[in-house]
Amino acid sequence: MTLAKRIIPCLDVTAGRVVKGVNFLELRDAGDPIEIARRYDEQGADEITFLDITATSDGRDLILDIIEAVASQVFIPLTVGGGVRAVDDVRRLLNAGADKVGINSSAISNPQLVFDASQKYGSQCIVVAIDAKKASDGRWEVFTHGGRKATGLDAVEWAKKMQNLGAGEILLTSMDRDGTKIGFDLDLTRSVSDAISIPVIASGGVGGLQDLADGVKVGRADAVLAASIFHYGQHTVQEAKRFMADQGIPMRLV
């Protein structure tokens, strides 16, 4: 049986509000995280991803209070990332109600964290987020700290390493496409999807429903993540699911 592909609305959170930017900059307020999460749950989203986008660069603590509030009202899986620096942070987020924990900058500075966390809590709980930008040599380079810090690492090779260390899923964001609404970087998505066996979530650049379908059909992603098209009422999750199902993509329709 073919696994259904997933639609995952993404809530970028800073200072307790949901925001959306372009190329990781120019942030615009999109609303209250608890209200928005509840709306997506009602619309039939498969999961919700929360990213505290300035926790690492600001050195702030985890957004446990928001996660507890959302988890008490939302009954689909929650992935939470931002500011995860230690195995104990993973524990605290899971205890607050997260189903999966995203690790990004800390996976670079301390790859052992991915191994230790997946050993303790299971690979199914650990999502490694990779923010990648096209380099002049044609590769994709990994960036950290909300896209502000270049690492010199090749995104495809890094995804392989993270799989080997125990990541259960890769959340792959094209920084070049983030917020641009011109579609996923399908070459990047396909290159990573073909290189690893764990699920890849495509992120960055969705401007319409065809972009979501292309992420799966062309990019070979297992799930597609979007923010702007859902936050500002351009489309609902149900519309997106019906559109993808009409193109022959297996979806969980509610």
From Swiss-Prot:
Listed InterPro entries: Aldolase_TIM (IPR013785), His_biosynth (IPR006062), HisF (IPR004651), IGPS_HisA/HisF (IPR050064), RibuloseP-bd_barrel (IPR011060)
GO CC, one annotated term: cytoplasm
Enzyme class label: lyase
Keywords for this protein: Amino-acid biosynthesis, Cytoplasm, Histidine biosynthesis, Lyase
Pathway: Amino-acid biosynthesis; L-histidine biosynthesis; L-histidine from 5-phospho-alpha-D-ribose 1-diphosphate: step 5/9
Subcellular location: Cytoplasm
Catalytic activity: 5-[(5-phospho-1-deoxy-D-ribulos-1-ylimino)methylamino]-1-(5-phospho-beta-D-ribosyl)imidazole-4-carboxamide + L-glutamine = D-erythro-1-(imidazol-4-yl)glycerol 3-phosphate + 5-amino-1-(5-phospho-beta-D-ribosyl)imidazole-4-carboxamide + L-glutamate + H(+)
Entry function: IGPS catalyzes the conversion of PRFAR and glutamine to IGP, AICAR and glutamate. The HisF subunit catalyzes the cyclization activity that produces IGP and AICAR from PRFAR using the ammonia provided by the HisH subunit.
Subunit structure: Heterodimer of HisH and HisF.
Family under the similarity heading: Belongs to the HisA/HisF family.
Protein name: Imidazole glycerol phosphate synthase subunit HisF
Lineage: Bacteria, Pseudomonadati, Pseudomonadota, Betaproteobacteria, Burkholderiales
Annotated gene: hisF
